[in-house]
Amino acid sequence: MKDDVYDRITNRIVESLEAGVRPWLKPWNADHAAGKITRPLRHNGQPYSGINVFMLWMEAEAAGYAAPIWMTFRQARELGGHVRKGEKGTLVVYANSITKTEQDSETGEDSTRTIPFMKGYTVFNVEQIDELPAHYYAKAAEPVLDPGERLEPVEAFLAATGADVSHGGNQAFYMPSQDRIQMPPFEFFRDPESYYATLLHETVHWTKHPKRMDREFGRKRWGDEGYAMEELVAEIGAAFLSADLGITPDIREDHASYIASWLKVLKNDKRAIFSAASHAQRAATFLHELQPAEPDTPAPDVIADQAPAPMGLRLS
């Protein structure tokens, strides 16, 4: 992928942040049930991952799409549909690499190295496509969770991670030296989803420990780019997990100060958002892989985004 595409995606996210909007926290509209969200899906129901999640969320929000399903022009045609004239597609990306063989000028020996890069392709929301089978146009399901109760599926998910969580005080944080998450009591939060979204954020931080994912971005004091990068990973990872678990991400009270620190990172490095999304995806996948196995039910979004395959082949 050319650098101008990195610029294009980063600049759009920067514009949203400068407007005070976190693109990964506003992926819903009035047509979605009570603000409940889902990851964007491919034509075969498999979820997108990484940076593609909130790129498609941003496009859905901007265009007012309620349907979460996206597909290529060819996939639409092979399903019997057609993209309406004048509709513009949305860029999604996937990782690829090439292997180069080079000869050492002094020794004459050949050596190989792998060069990673990003490639992109275009998809359309099903609301831009006519004459698809009817089930592609289905609206989001009605909410089934009572907001006044603890959310048992989320409780079970968090318990299965094995993270050490203590309750008390009025701050939420992960303490690496003790490998422990500290949370205010459940009843201190304005609603259950605020509690769980906050705990998911701290649980993503928990994955950085050396005995788990060993994630390190350098300097870790407030205001440092390393600190801001880790917070960005936790923020995006919590948004991914919230979507997987069917809860609405929380807006933190320190919204403005964090946005300022993220803007600094993104403006200094056009690839930083790709790195943050990749680390966030790995953290979410790590936590899903700690869950008890269910027959024939893969963990959401453990599949990396790849190029679109011909119909009849499984997209992964």
Stretches with model-predicted labels:
Residues 1-316:
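N-terminal accessory/interface modules of nucleic-acid-binding and processing proteins
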